From Swiss-Prot:
Catalyzes the ATP-dependent phosphorylation of sn-l,2-diacylglycerol (DAG) to phosphatidic acid. Involved in the recycling of diacylglycerol produced as a by-product during membrane-derived oligosaccharide (MDO) biosynthesis. The chain crosses the membrane at residues 35-55, 58-78, 108-128. Its EC number is 2.7.1.107. A divalent metal cation binds at residues 34, 82. GO terms for cellular component: plasma membrane. Belongs to the bacterial diacylglycerol kinase family. One of its GO terms (biological process) is phosphatidic acid biosynthetic process. The gene is dgkA. This is Diacylglycerol kinase. The lineage of its organism: Bacteria, Pseudomonadati, Campylobacterota, Epsilonproteobacteria, Campylobacterales. It catalyses: a 1,2-diacyl-sn-glycerol + ATP = a 1,2-diacyl-sn-glycero-3-phosphate + ADP + H(+).
Length: 128
């Protein structure tokens, strides 16, 4: 067995404060270890800045950045599923492959949604 011990549970604002640090650690880990996460974040930042210049109001801006944030969240979930599956063992198992493939397909759907929203907006902008 490993020497890893689960820290005692905090309560109240202390729990919230600790949760923020756990989230920060998760983002640092994803940035350091997952190239797909870095690519999605860089693309999202570019699109958020571009949306700030292209849109006329807050609603348009919000609708354009929604798929950006959605894809970042999906990539975090995808990466965490991959890490959990890799932790369970190194040998190939069909269920492990299915879990990884389904998580990856969720990201594909998110990226298609992103392309659809931005493509439709840019076409509307171009033809008006």
């Amino acid at each position: 067995m490993s020497d890893f011990k689960v820290p005692p549970k905090a309560k109240g604002f202390k729990r919230l404060f600790k949760a923020l640090f756990y989230s920060k650690d998760g983002l640092k880990c994803a940035w350091a270890e997952e190239s797909a996460f870095r690519q999605i974040v860089i693309l999202a930042l570019f699109c958020i800045v571009l949306a700030s210049y292209l849109t006329k109001d807050f609603l348009e801006w919000g609708l354009l950045i929604l798929p950006c944030f959605l894809s970042v969240v999906i990539e975090l979930i995808n990466s965490s599923i991959e890490k959990a599956v890799d932790f369970t063992g190194t040998e190939f198992h069909p269920l492990a492959k299915k879990a990884k493939d389904m998580a990856s397909s969720a990201q594909l759907i998110g990226l298609i949604f992103w392309a659809f929203i931005w493509g439709r907006y840019l076409l509307t902008l171009y033809f008006n």
